Design a protein with these regions (language model features):
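Cell-envelope/extracellular polymer assembly enzymes that use nucleotide-activated donors
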Residues: 19-21, 46, 200
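Acidic helix N-cap motif at the loop->helix transition within catalytic regions
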Residues: 31-35, 56-65
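Acceptor/aglycone-binding surface of glycosyltransferases and processive sugar-polymer synthases
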Residues: 72-95, 100, 112-195, 221-232
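Short beta-strand/loop segment that forms part of the nucleotide-sugar
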Residues: 37, 45-54, 74-75
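Short, well-formed alpha-helical segments that are part of the catalytic scaffolds
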Residues: 27-43
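A conserved acidic beta->alpha catalytic loop
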Residues: 51-60, 78, 108
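Hydrophobic helical membrane-anchoring modules
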Residues: 2-15, 190-192, 196-332
Length: 332
């Protein structure tokens, strides 16, 4: 019997590899950027170097010395910060038709050979956004400066609160990958352009219910000096994380849905506030009149605080389990 046209078609067509673009924001990276570019593998289709008004002429150095046809250099007239440079690269990558966009720093601390591992969960439809995690391997922490370990522990906890990704660590890690559909849905014009960039992206992804996955990695530390001043960024990060916590809780539990967790939060806060206000009032009264508060007064102040704290603990328990599990980009 002669085969029909349908018989000639493959039963299990091979899925084409996604077009991957790498964005490398640069500021004072002339010492390392050429080595980083040389180590980017063949799986990457385009490489976008963004010169963020570098005083050392990183962009010019790449143009003059890198012959890789995949490399394109964009230049800022003024410094916009790591976030601003990255988003310039993101926009250009989308214009080029990239399906997955990787952010890779130009300081040599990240191994470009790990790009396939970073991209794999997104290409397989298991995640919308992936990021490196330098804390996954305990022995590797010995090579991390102590100030970075301490700072990352604090920033990771704040990021968990503001983003809702309780299973994600190392939020300031700049080795990331994102699906282009998710990237198009992000309000890039609202995202912080400076050092808060990565944490702000996680917050925006949390509002979208995008799936974020950590990828274990090792960072290489040389003699480069970090541009981040911990004493300077801590107050800024505290304020921005606090605002993002308020926005996330309001949108997640009072706009997008309203359930038992929302009630637990509202009632728990009311009970706590009432108990504290009532207790403070009678404590002040007893100090002025020198008359001890009665047992009933103490119980009436303590009981709402106890009940309120239990309700708030129940809300936090629900929130920590309310981490997105279903990737969003296949639905867009």
């Amino acid at each position: 019997m002669n085969p029909t046209p349908d018989d000639d078609e493959p039963r299990n067509p091979v899925r084409m590899a996604p077009m991957i673009a790498v964005v490398i924001p640069c500021y004072r990276e002339a010492r390392h950027v050429l080595d980083v570019l040389a180590r980017v593998g063949a799986e990457v289709g385009r490489i976008i170097v963004v010169d963020d008004a570098c005083p050392d002429g990183t962009g010019r150095l790449v143009r003059e010395n890198c012959k890789d046809p995949r490399v394109e250099v964009l230049t800022h007239d003024r410094n916009k910060g790591v976030g601003g440079a990255t988003m310039t690269g993101y926009r250009h990558a989308m214009e080029l038709g990239a399906e997955i966009v990787v952010k890779l720093d130009g300081d040599g601390q990240m191994d470009p050979a790990m790009i396939p591992e970073l991209v794999k969960p997104i290409a397989a439809g298991e995640a919308d956004y992936t990021k490196g995690n330098r804390f996954h391997q305990f022995l590797a922490l010995g090579r991390m400066p102590p100030v970075r370990i301490t700072g990352n522990m604090l920033l990771s906890f704040l990021s968990k609160l503001s983003s809702g990704y309780w299973d994600v660590f190392d939020p300031t890690n700049g080795f990331t990958a994102i699906h282009a559909k998710i990237l198009r849905a992000l309000p890039l014009e609202k995202i912080s352009e400076r050092f808060f960039f990565e944490s702000d992206v996680l917050f925006r992804l949390g509002l979208m219910r995008a799936v974020v996955k950590d990828i274990p990695m090792q960072a290489r530390y040389g003699d480069e000096v970090s541009a981040i001043s911990i004493p300077r960024i801590i107050p800024e990060f505290l304020i921005k994380h606090y605002l993002n916590v308020c926005r996330r809780v309001y949108y997640t539990y009072f706009v997008r849905e309203f359930g038992f967790a929302s009630i637990q939060l509202v009632v728990g806060k009311l009970f706590m506030l009432f108990g504290l206000a009532y207790g403070i009032y009678w404590w002040h009264d007893s100090t002025v009149t020198d008359i001890p508060a009665t047992a009933g007064t103490v119980v009436l102040a303590a009981l709402p605080i106890i009940l309120g704290s239990q309700l708030l603990i129940a809300f936090i328990n629900y929130d920590t389990r309310n981490v997105p599990r279903r990737p969003v980009h296949p639905l867009l």
